[in-house]
Amino acid sequence: MSKSRAVVELTARFDLGGDDKIRALSLSPISDSQTLVYLGTYSGSLILLSLDTLTNTVSRLASVSLSPSPVESIFVLGEERGRVLALCNGYLFLLDSLLSQPAKRLGGLLKGINVIAKRVRGRDSSSTDLLPSEISTDSSSSKKFLQLLGAGNLVSDVRGNDSRHERVQQGHYVFAVAIGERMLLIELQCAEKEGLSGSFVVLKEILGIGGIKTLVWLDDYVIAGTVKGYSLISCVTGLSGVIFTLPDVSGPPLLKLLCKEWKVLLLVDNVGVVVDTNGQPIGGSLVFRRRPDSVGELSFYLVTVGDGKMEIHQKKSGACVQSVSFGPQGCGPSLLAADEAGDGNLLVVTTLSKLIFYRRVPYEEQIKDLLRKKRYRETISLVEELDSQGEISKDMLSFLHAQIGYLLLFDLRFEEAVNQFLKSEKMEPSEVFPFIMRDPNRWSLVVPRNRYWGLHPPPAPFEDVVDNGLMAIQRANFLRKAGMDTPVDEEFFSDPPSRADLLDSAIKNITRYLEISREKGLTLPVREGIDTLLMLLYRALNRVEDMENLASSGNNCVVEELETLLTESGHLRTLAFLYATKGMGAKALAIWRLFTKNYSSGLWQDSDDLVPYLHDNELIRLSGKEAAAAEAARILEEPCDPELALQHLSWIADVNPLFAIQVLTSDKRTEELSPEQVIQAIDPKKVEIIQRYFQWLIEERDYTDPQLHTSYALSLARSALECVEVQNGIQEADVPNGSEAHDSNVGSISLFEVDVRERLQAFLQSSDLYDPEEILELVEGSELWLEKAILYRRIGKETLVLQILALKLEDCAAAEQYCVEIGRPDAFMQLLDMYLDPQNGKEPMFKAAVRLLHNHGESLDPLQVLDKLSPDMPLKLASDTILRMLRARVHHHRQGQIVHNISRALDVDSRLARLEERSRHMQINDESLCDSCYARLGTKLFAMYPDDTIVCYKCYRRLGESKSVTGRDFKRDVLIKPGWLVNR
């Protein structure tokens, strides 16, 4: 046996003895441990052998002589107590399976047969059912006589059955036989109860095809091989076509049905072409080393024999995986038969009078052999092939991937090892823990003790694995120099890797495995081990960003295992994130505070570095101090101890007031902070933080504490006063200095988008809970005129409000609107007096006075207006306005008179209409009926409604005085009749 993979192994040999040679061969398994072997010889004998697969012994059971001519073909029909059909000397012979009875020859039309093939139907075939026409009771006596003689019933056509169910009953088999220039499709009927009696029915006769050497019948098509080439024949229509022709110098045709794929292999010398049922080539050609005498199918392999050698090829690629010599070169033609009906593990090869039995090596042993030889690629290919053919279970497939992965890992091929681990569905991620952390450790008990094949050492830390692997490479290199063959990969000899590179590759790939394993549904201890060890691996690779992402997200890291290591290595940010996710906020805040204090002492690389920070799902870059404060604020935004928030609020506000506001105004907090304690915790100089906090309490939390509202208003007022002082100082200074003062505040952080005075004015107008007098006391002597106007209005000092609006702010529209809100005419007169006599040496505001008279002159008394007008007022300014005011006054007076008179007329009209309604007369006679009950009124009392309906007194009491028989309710739906005023 040559050096190759052991797919099959020799199990037994048998020699017929004498000069008789084997011409035909067929196998029939009858149990798991016994297989019958039928041999056809050149002398015309049929010999039965038995192979015991448990003891690998071969025994001769029986033999039958059929004819002096060679036995060409043997078919085993049925399973238990079946039949054997043999082709010898152009005739078909029917025998029992044990050859215990004499053979019966089928005569009639079946003589001179060259080749015979049994019909095979695919698993999902929709081929036509071949059903012979039943012999009816009125059939001619000649047809019945021919059938009784065994001549067969000739059927001229093939009928299809709608149910697509072929009539293959017990003892009914369909064959194609080639006789001279014609081919017959027959059904052989072998009734079990009738012993060897059998008959056949001719289903179809196809003419015009001669010289057939080999046949395969699959579904609706027969593929025939002749010396000229291969043809495709339809068993339905009888039409034939050429698949391809053979070269002039070529060996005889050879066909092999591939039962696994339901395809057919066509041989052209040493080239095999696979075609489907329609004769269409599928895939590429298979090139063998020599032209085979016979071809067999063993699982997903093709087996060829010839010239004393047996070769096993992969079906897909045609690559030879094993070559076995079973006889001398030039020993003559060989035959091959495989157990295609049983478990598919038995293979028999014949040469002359000898039989050699082979059994397929179990795939576990094949894989073990390949793994021992470190032929990993072939192993993986074999495993994938077994999986695609469905010959291994999912559990076994998972086991094999894990086993291959372990061997690759100990061979320092870490990437390929992890790829195999990932393909293993049953492998536990905890199995790789011993490669990362030495035993004993926290997770030693969760590592499963899976039983592998013992082809690799027990798991050990990667340092030991790499060291042992490098030593093995050195030993292999020494042995190779000594002339010995070693299984070490050539890559390690040509380009030996360094220890550091191997460790880096090991850590990177096992990190990849753990990252993917996190997505699996695992127990809590295993999840803790994965995340904790993953953090250690990130630390070893110095992947700081991955460390921080893992620590800041949902994880199962064990803090006790990482706390000391992260502190020693200086990964304090990662440790702070880890503390925060584990609910240890106090420790995390201590680290963030330490960062802000020691920012320039080496905890950060460079004070100018910007740190990425995720804020509202948007990645921004902050300075190191700001990033630390932001992370601290993020912790304090969550539900936590209020004392903890107050403790760290001050330094967060020192770094960035925005983060302090996030802490104070967090909606996630379950326990509110005390406003008094918050004010004490914040530096009084950080006025905007306090104001923003007050604003949040009042607007978002709806606080109604008057003291809080007053404090907020006072704080805003103080800020407004400071702002006014700053603005006055800028205006008094020179322009360049003013610009410089303005630029110096550009970099400051503002918590508000609205000016402080606008916020103060809005709050003073919206809130009713503050103390206006206390605020007035603060702003009394300031220039905050509008604010003071709002406050004076709160306490009801209308005159002061008008003075501020009209004289200080000169806001005529606001002053007039305030007078409208007061709603008294004297307010407009008071405003007019202020415009005409402003006092304090101010000039009269004639335009404002004219505007007031123009807009609200109708509300003023003309005499009082004329009395108030100053003699100094230009007549041209006021003449038109006064004239329009007087006209409007007269118009309003006359309009009032008109309205008064119209009202009186309507009143008179309604009285007259009511009088007319009450004075109406209704004539009742003997024929008058009640509109409700239709009773004669006669001399009864009755009532009449405004819609002229009449009812008796009884119905009136029932309906009421406001609702008539028509359903109209006169209280809701008043009936209006035109009066004298409308008629006029």
Swiss-Prot record:
Each CHCR repeat occupies one of these ranges, namely 663-844
Domain CNH as annotated: residue spans: 21-339
| Topology of this chain in the membrane | Peripheral membrane protein
Q: Which GO terms describe its cellular component?
A: CORVET complex; cytoplasm; endosome membrane
Q: What happens when the gene is disrupted?
A: Embryonic lethality. Heterozygous mutants produce some yellowish seeds with developmentally retarded or abnormally shaped embryos. Conditional dexamethasone (DEX)-inducible mutants exhibit abnormal root morphology.
Summarizing the function annotation, the protein's role is: Essential protein required during embryogenesis. Believed to act as a component of the putative class C core vacuole/endosome tethering (CORVET) endosomal tethering complexes. CORVET is required for vacuolar transport of SYP22. Involved in root development. Plays a role in vesicle-mediated protein trafficking of the endocytic membrane transport pathway.
UniProt keyword Protein transport, yes or no? yes
Any single GO BP term = root morphogenesis
> PROSITE patterns annotated for this entry?
CNH
Protein's name in the database: Vacuolar sorting protein 3
Q: Cross-referenced PANTHER family, in alphabetical order?
A: CNH DOMAIN CONTAINING (PTHR12894), VACUOLAR SORTING PROTEIN 3 (PTHR12894:SF43)
Subunit structure of this entry? Component of the class C core vacuole/endosome tethering (CORVET) complex. Their common core is composed of the class C Vps core proteins VPS11, VCL1, VPS18 and VPS33, which in CORVET further associates with VPS3. Interacts directly with VPS11. Binds to RABF2A and RABF2B.
What are the UniProt keywords, alphabetically?
A: Cytoplasm, Endosome, Membrane, Protein transport, Transport
Q: Any keyword Transmembrane helix?
A: no
Gene for this chain: VPS3
Its taxonomic path starts at: Eukaryota, Viridiplantae, Streptophyta, Embryophyta, Tracheophyta
The UniProt entry's sequence similarity note says: Belongs to the TRAP1 family.
